[in-house]
A protein has these predicted regions:
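N-terminal cap/leader regions of alpha/beta-hydrolase-fold enzymes
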Residues: 1-247
Length: 247
């Protein structure tokens, strides 16, 4: 694993961050920001970031829970062991939101811009679960710096909240990819239709794929709902998106 652990000064403090580079070959390579899911930084996300890096990218994985202070990796098994298991996430998820993460992203983008091993003027973003909405939000708030943005099993992408990503899509300049599960209470069909309508109205270059048979969290190999076939399809879509837009 070609990994560098560092601290990036973000608006509300020092953000623990890992940067992954390809294990083979010589750079520079295009930069990508990997926005985590709501379970926090843990080995599966680090492995995913390295896999993406090995496709030919410099991947920055920030800990968006930095405002909550230091914490041990969350026990994913305990989260799903009982109905109350997910309550452990409450203080962490409350430490960030789409708007705060978008402000943080300016610092992440500056870091990538200053690295000698990063090429190009545009960066890609990808996000999972809560990170999906953050990925789309950053594609809007930093539109001139984002070449492509992806969301996989992202929730609450088109709601009545003032933080809803669909309200900002008219600012997006890059390409957008949405990978949605067909069994996801956080992103039901009516919400998907609302997001697609907003993307079309804003003339955003986008693709919206439904992963049939997949549930919320299907890309995460430490989740009970992990779907190997759909996860493989997600990798193909993600790497193709960035290879077509960031090279």
């Amino acid at each position: 694993m070609a990994r560098e652990d560092l601290s990036i000064q973000a608006p509300d403090g020092a953000c623990r961050t890992s940067v992954f580079t390809p294990t083979k070959g010589a750079g520079p390579w295009p930069g990508v920001i990997f926005f985590m899911d709501g379970v926090g930084i843990r080995p599966v996300l680090q492995s995913m970031a390295q896999r993406l890096a090995d496709a030919g990218f410099v991947v920055l994985l920030p800990d968006l829970f930095y405002r909550a202070g230091e914490y041990d990796p969350i026990d994913v098994g305990a989260l799903f062991a009982s109905p109350d298991g997910r309550k452990a996430l409450t203080p962490f998820i409350g430490a960030t939101d789409n708007h705060r993460a978008a402000r943080d992203a300016e610092s992440f983008l500056d870091h990538l811009q200053d690295r000698s091993d990063v090429s190009g003027t545009k960066v890609g973003t990808t996000g999972y679960c809560m990170g999906g909405g953050i990925s789309l939000t950053v594609a809007a708030t930093a539109a001139n710096r984002i070449g492509a943005a992806a969301s996989f099993h992202g929730g609450s992408l088109a709601t009545d909240s003032e933080m809803s990503p669909h309200l900002l899509v008219d600012q997006i300049q890059g390409r957008v990819y949405i990978g949605a599960a067909d069994n996801d209470g956080s992103y039901p069909p009516a919400m998907a239709a609302r997001l697609i309508e907003a993307l079309m109205a804003a003339h955003v270059d986008h693709r919206h794929d439904l992963y049939v048979g997949a549930a919320h969290g299907w890309t995460m190999s430490d989740f009970p709902v992990y779907h190997e076939e759909a996860a493989g399809r997600h990798w193909h879509a993600l790497t193709a998106l960035f290879m077509e837009t960031l090279q």
